[in-house]
Amino acid sequence: MTQQLPTLSLKKIYSGKVRDLYEIDDKRMLMVASDRLSAFDVILDDPIPRKGEILTQISNFWFNKLAHIMPNHFTGESVYDVLPKEEADLIKDRAVVCKRLNPIKIESIVRGYLTGSGLKDYKQTGTICGLKLPEGLVEASKLAEPIFTPSSKEAVGSHDINISYAECEKLIGADLAAQVKEKAIALYTAAAEYALTKGIIICDTKFEFGLDENGMLTLMDEVLTPDSSRFWSIDTYQEGINPPSFDKQFIRDWLENSGWNKQAPAPKVPENIIQKTVDKYQEALDLLTK
């Protein structure tokens, strides 16, 4: 039963894997985070209760915390400024009024540790996205410094593809690529330092950037949530093993072991796995913001 968000009086202009966008005017839109969950680029039938609210709170926390590094998509307005009260009441904890930006056509991924597709690439070639790494690194090795490893943006339902920095420059231009790389690494570095003080290692994360009407690079979409990042607990971190994470890893692991072929439709996820996932998202919010 895929979650249906309340019908709003605004015009829906986009429905993504997790978020729906509504038009306010030519400068602003409303972004609403659903409880939908995607794994292996397939949207699961079962929503994760309150996930959209938790993700929105985590994102908003980081947008504010990192505002000194660069501008973000906030307009400063609340949902009550753009919706009738009865509609705003229903989505106030999962919606944000944001600027309409021209999205940059790459996924800006920063890695501080080696795991996932980065580890796979490294094992095969000794590099990630064309960047040479030292020999002898293993699962969960901390990198000497954070690296920018962009991927191309594919259509919903397709897998994003890791690209080299040179390919990134080709796609978006050398000047913009340099700005994106610098800002992405600065955001990751500041966030990772803060998170460590709260007992969380940010292994890697994906940022989304856009350009405003004046061509100013602006942080958008979601920031440093368990959906866009891998969070590990300092307590369970150990080089050489894949640490448990504060995100949909429970569900991904269950799906990996279920014999599913990773094509839609996905199998039904057991209630206890869904509850564990909610608890992990909530724990990430509590640790980061308290």
Model-inferred region functions:
Residues 1-152, 262-289:
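Active-site loop/lid in soluble adenylation, ligation, and acyl-transfer enzymes
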Residues 110, 202-223:
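Conserved metal-phosphate-binding beta-hairpin within the catalytic cores
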Residues 28, 103-105, 199-202, 214-217, ...:
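Coil-to-beta-strand transition motifs
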Residues 172-203:
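A long amphipathic alpha-helix within ATP-dependent nucleotide-binding catalytic cores
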Residues 124-128, 132-176, 219, 223-288:
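Anionic ligand-binding catalytic core segments
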Residues 67-73, 190-202, 215, 289-290:
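Surface-exposed helix-capping loop/turn segments at secondary-structure junctions
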